[in-house]
A protein has these predicted regions:
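NTP-binding/hydrolysis catalytic cores, primarily Walker-type P-loop NTPases
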Residues: 150-198
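Proline-rich low-complexity regions
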Residues: 22, 79, 138, 152-153, ...
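P-loop/Walker-type NTP enzyme "switch/lid" segment
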Residues: 1-46, 147-149, 154
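Electropositive phosphate-/nucleotide-binding environments in soluble metabolic enzymes
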Residues: 3, 31-34, 84, 119, ...
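Exposed alpha-helical structural elements
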Residues: 4, 8, 36, 121-124, ...
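Conserved catalytic-core segment of NTP-binding enzymes
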Residues: 35, 39, 43-46, 50-145
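Generic secondary-structure signature for well-ordered alpha-helical cores
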Residues: 10, 14, 50, 130-131, ...
């Protein structure tokens, strides 16, 4: 690796094989081009088994920079109509950029609301987006607690912590079955399906 990349990498105190490459706080996203981002990822590939790129919200320069060097995408959405529409749009842009290996993560789902029909079910979301599901993260206050304490959620014996661990195992190629979740077609499914497929 070039010396400037080595100097920019921050090693995690708890996980010696985990590094973070933060973006510059003094520059905006237009300071880096998609071509430069692609070159950076190529330089990192030989030294790392997995490179996760956190994509900014919105579909602007930051989005195209983030996907420039990607060979796989994990779309994280929540069970809300507006979020599902955004995820559908992102899927189309990824496919247009020739990223075909796209998986879905559903975040902050509340099974009590799904049972009452007040929230789209996992089945609803997968039906609308037609993506392979790689994980479901239940709404869990421990996520907020861990984030505020600067701690990793893995190692917490919580539903969300277990969900993150299972997603990681699936990314690494393990066959980890998805749990059985409540299924119920909600009013929101019909609304989202109409808005996306009209």
């Amino acid at each position: 690796l070039p010396i400037w990349i080595k100097q920019a990498l921050i090693r995690d105190k708890r996980y010696p094989n985990l590094f973070l490459l933060p973006s510059a706080q003094t520059r905006d996203k237009t300071s880096v081009s998609p071509e430069q981002m692609k070159k950076l990822i190529e330089q990192l590939r030989d030294d790392f088994d997995y490179i996760l790129i956190d994509c900014p919200a919105g579909i602007e320069r930051g989005f195209y920079n983030a996907i420039a060097g990607a060979d796989r995408a994990l779309i994280v959405t929540t069970p809300e109509v507006s979020a599902i529409r955004d995820a559908d749009r992102i899927t189309g842009l990824l496919e247009a950029s020739h990223i075909k290996n796209i998986n879905l993560i559903i975040n902050r789902i509340r099974f009590d609301m799904v049972r009452r029909g007040d929230m789209m079910s996992i089945e609803d979301i997968v039906d609308i987006l037609s993506l392979d599901l790689i994980g479901v993260i239940p709404d869990d206050e421990n996520v907020v607690v861990a984030a505020n304490q600067g701690e990793s959620l893995t190692g917490y014996h919580t539903p969300a912590g277990k969900a993150y661990e299972n997603i990681c195992r699936r990314i690494m190629g393990e066959d980890v079955p998805l749990a059985c979740y409540p299924r119920r077609k909600s009013f929101f499914f019909r609304v989202a399906d109409y808005l996306i497929h009209r």
